[in-house]
């Protein structure tokens, strides 16, 4: 099994979904980031991920990384959420963002903002100004969730 699949199994054991694994640099430090989301609904909204859940997940993942280091050299493990406003770059991330507001930039340079309704195969469906709009995933050059204050 791959390292990502092993991490994903720990994430799922806590009733969370793996959103993204990334490597970042902060000066001389290397950071191995594991971002997770909750798919549970509470009071009609997606439930957040608690700090305790992130700590618990970090403690589950850390021994695995001691045995199978994700990169050479020293690194810091960070477990958290991708935030309210985050990039959306894979079909899985679109699925995990259903019910949230998204801003899309298409390859044609057209920009769309709306509520993400559903994902079917490689089509993304949005509610844009009370009209359902279908966008093919391959036509999206950039996407992110956004929060309306």
Swiss-Prot record:
It comes from Sulfurimonas denitrificans (strain ATCC 33889 / DSM 1251). This is Ribosome maturation factor RimP. InterPro entries: Ribosome_maturation_RimP, RimP_C, RimP_C_sf, RimP_N, RimP_N_sf. GO terms for cellular component: cytosol. It is found in: Cytoplasm. One of its GO terms (biological process) is translation. It holds the Pfam family DUF150_C. Required for maturation of 30S ribosomal subunits. Keywords: Cytoplasm, Ribosome biogenesis. It comes from the Bacteria. Belongs to the RimP family. The gene is rimP. The keyword Aminoacyl-tRNA synthetase does not apply. CDD domains: YlxS_C (cd01734).
């Amino acid at each position: 099994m791959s390292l990502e699949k092993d991490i994903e199994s720990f994430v799922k054991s806590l009733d969370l979904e793996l959103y993204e694994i990334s490597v970042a640099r902060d000066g001389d430090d290397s950071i191995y980031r594991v971002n997770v989301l909750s798919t549970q609904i509470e009071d009609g909204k997606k439930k957040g991920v608690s700090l305790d859940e992130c700590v618990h997940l970090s403690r589950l993942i850390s021994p695995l990384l001691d045995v199978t280091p994700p990169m050479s050299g020293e690194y810091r493990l960070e477990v958290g959420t991708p935030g309210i406003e985050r990039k959306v770059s894979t079909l899985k991330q679109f699925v995990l963002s259903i019910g949230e507001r998204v801003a899309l930039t298409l390859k044609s340079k057209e920009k769309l903002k709306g509520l993400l309704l559903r994902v079917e195969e490689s089509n993304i469906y949005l509610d844009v100004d009370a009209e359902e709009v279908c966008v093919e995933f391959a036509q999206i050059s950039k996407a992110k969730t956004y929060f309306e204050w």
